[in-house]
Amino acid sequence: MKVNGIEPDINNISSGKYTLRRSYYLTHNGEMNHLQQDFLQYVLCAGQKLVAKKSIAVGTPTTFLSAKASGKLVINGSSSAAPLVKELAAEYMQLNPRAQVTVEVTDSSKGLTAAIRRECDFGISSRELKSYEKELLTANVFARDAIVLIVNKQNPVNNLSTKQIKALYETCNEWKSLN
């Protein structure tokens, strides 16, 4: 189904023309250590190949040579983005067996708060950061997803405005009552 006259295809979602989309963020507080830098570099480079299979990549996959930094990373946050981050972490640990990456599934707010408090190495968010979060954290978009509306083939409606979608969830009980 089109939203505001725009098809929900990869190009429209990536470019922002299709508006029912969101970004996935990896956030951190302050200077990163070598392991954090290495992991983030992987996610934004070679990891984009995996991202493209599961979601919408924000970059083109490029070659990644791990610095083989050792240590533990704790990543905390969004239940929507965590499955993808878990897969990225598993792939990264194959490239860098000296790293141990743990992904804790909570929600975006808890992940961002944990990153602000330095209770984790990265916070994961699937929502836009609030102004104070932007001041306290560095955020890197690593993937995008979109909400796509699917209706019965018999339904003649093929395009809705965001106002109409909101009405469907708040006040309308029938398709014919949409304006």
Question: Can you describe what each PLM-predicted range is?
Answer:
Residues 1-179:
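Exported/periplasmic ABC-transporter solute-binding proteins
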